[in-house]
């Protein structure tokens, strides 16, 4: 068994969890597929940057981690999705180290929420 080295991974703040957590190539039986696992926080990194269009710095602040930690999540997510799509593997979204938070109605509300968390 591998020993964990370095600092423990801190939980990421996640605004959305997916309703659908499994994707597979059409026409291929599930029993014959290899599966790539994508964590909830990796999916959140993809959503914030690629769908919402946030800069990585802003997305990292929203998730509550450093830019480097956010970049590692985003890089891992993109690699896993590209691997699954290019090699015909299934994608399973599960697990991770995250805290589910409510979505702020406006950016101003989000800034206030982040400020309050920093003060605590």
Swiss-Prot record:
Listed InterPro entries: UPF0251, WH-like_DNA-bd_sf
Gene3D superfamilies, sorted: Winged helix-like DNA-binding domain superfamily/Winged helix DNA-binding domain (1.10.10.10)
Pfam entry (one): DUF134
HAMAP family: UPF0251
Family (UniProt): Belongs to the UPF0251 family.
Name assigned to this protein: UPF0251 protein MM_0989
Protein species of origin: Methanosarcina mazei (strain ATCC BAA-159 / DSM 3647 / Goe1 / Go1 / JCM 11833 / OCM 88) (Methanosarcina frisia)
